Amino acid sequence: MRAEARHQLKEDRFSKATLQAAEKTVHWTQEHQSKLIAAAIAVLVIAAIAIGGWYYMQQQDEKASLDLAAAVRTLETPLRPAGTPAQPGFDSFESLTERATAARKQFQAILDKYPSTRTGKMARYFVGLTSAQLGDNAAAESNLQQAAGSSDSDLASLGKFALASVYRGENKDAQAIDLYKQLIDKPTTVVSKVMAQMELASFYESRQKPDEAKKIYEQVQKENPSTESASMAQRKAAALK
């Protein structure tokens, strides 16, 4: 198979996988972000690992990909009820903080060891996410800002989307709004226009700006007739006071 054909096949497979991941994160809101980070974003990462390892065939990036897969598994490890002892032979964590701390350490090690690889850059994104989960906003901002500035449009959009959530938590409203609008203007396969619109509308609702939120919900309905997104936007608009 010629190099161009292999490249196109890789791009087609990556687009399909990342689109599926994006669809799974449509309902991601700031309130339950920590629950969906591992489940939804891991779909994207595992797909990228499989395709990236096959396409580049570079030993260093393959090793980094294996390490990243292990770190993602840590981030998805189940939590056990408080006061319940760990079961021998079954990985678990007692709290979100304990799990995020362990995962961040793994992601940081990948970033330190493979900073110039695509996998290393993805690890930086996860360092930002886990830092946000731990309330380390300075580290979250620093790492997510770098991810948001990536030349990889998919990684950049994920970085912006997560960074906007961090800004929301810090009441940096202007910065959050700007990022959502950037994503609306230039959507990607992993962060669609609808995804960014719904998050911006949710943000306006949280700031008691129902008129602004309603405008966006109406726009979503107009641009996406007869879709689940339109139905969701209609319900949310109807619930506004």
Residue ranges and their predicted role:
Residues 1-39:
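N-terminal positive-inside, membrane-proximal cytosolic segments immediately preceding the first
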